[in-house]
């Protein structure tokens, strides 16, 4: 089975590019960030501070995650509820980064993520796919861009959705998540030694897509 690992910081465009690449190659796309977002959402709904590891650990036995791939798109279910849309807020994104630093949460999700890769060709994106989840992935890509470029893209997405958030706030959030993701003790964000680096700061979506498609094709034929 072929496995493609795409890692990188928040707002690098991993999910958007990964969806398109998976559709192009006919692979199943697994968005691991959605899993952490779902844990973060559950913590927020339970009135718990996502950074409080002990409080979040106590919630894990009450959480059942299920996945469905509908027309190649991953849908995630939290205790039977489709939360695929509910998890896409900035607040939940920050909560995801916080629970992502929790070793118990990472362990809770790790086997789930690995099991999804066993029976099928997959393309998985996240923060530690190439380093921890799929260390023997067929292809590893580390996707990045400057904080300013990533904040600009995210701000434009918010504008299109009618969310009026100042650019400065978006940039501050991006930088805060970068710090949290790179400084956590459990599986910090870093480039795998055998990953190919792609900086998309000066590339548009199509250019980034073609560059990644070429990287994958060169490895898998």
Regions found by a protein language model. Give the residues of each.
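Hydrophobic positions on the alpha1 helix immediately C-terminal to the Walker A/P-loop
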Residues: 17
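N-terminal phosphate/diphosphate-binding loop that engages ATP/GTP or pyrophosphate donors
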Residues: 23-89
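Conserved lysine of the Walker
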Residues: 14
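Hydrophobic anchor at the beta1->P-loop junction of P-loop NTPases
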Residues: 6
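Walker A (P-loop) phosphate-binding loop of P-loop NTPases
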Residues: 11
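Small-molecule kinase domains that catalyze NTP-dependent phosphoryl transfer to phosphate-bearing small molecules
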Residues: 68, 113-120, 132, 136, ...
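ATP-dependent NMP and nucleoside kinases share a basic, alpha-helical "lid"
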Residues: 84-161
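Pre-Walker A (Motif I) flank of P-loop NTPase domains
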Residues: 1-3, 119
């Amino acid at each position: 089975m072929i496995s493609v690992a795409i890692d990188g910081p928040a707002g690098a465009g991993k999910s958007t590019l990964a969806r398109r690449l998976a559709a192009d190659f006919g692979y199943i796309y697994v968005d691991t960030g959605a899993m952490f977002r779902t844990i973060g959402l559950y913590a927020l709904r339970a009135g718990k501070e996502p950074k409080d590891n002990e409080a979040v650990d106590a919630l894990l036995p009450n959480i059942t995650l299920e996945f469905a791939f509908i027309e190649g798109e991953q849908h995630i279910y939290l205790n039977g509820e489709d939360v695929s849309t509910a998890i896409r807020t900035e607040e939940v994104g920050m909560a995801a980064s916080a629970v992502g630093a929790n070793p118990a949460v990472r362990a809770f999700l790790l086997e789930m993520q690995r099991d999804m890769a066993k029976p099928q060709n997959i393309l998985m994106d996240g923060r530690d796919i190439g380093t921890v989840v799929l260390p023997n992935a067929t292809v590893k890509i580390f996707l990045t861009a400057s904080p300013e470029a990533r904040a600009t893209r995210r701000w434009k997405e918010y504008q299109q959705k009618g969310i009026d958030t100042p650019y400065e706030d978006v940039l501050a959030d991006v930088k805060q998540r970068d710090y949290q993701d790179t400084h956590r003790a459990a599986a910090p964000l870093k480039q795998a030694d055998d990953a190919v680096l792609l900086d998309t700061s000066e590339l548009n979506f199509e250019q980034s897509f073609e560059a990644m498609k070429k990287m994958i094709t060169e490895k898998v034929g």
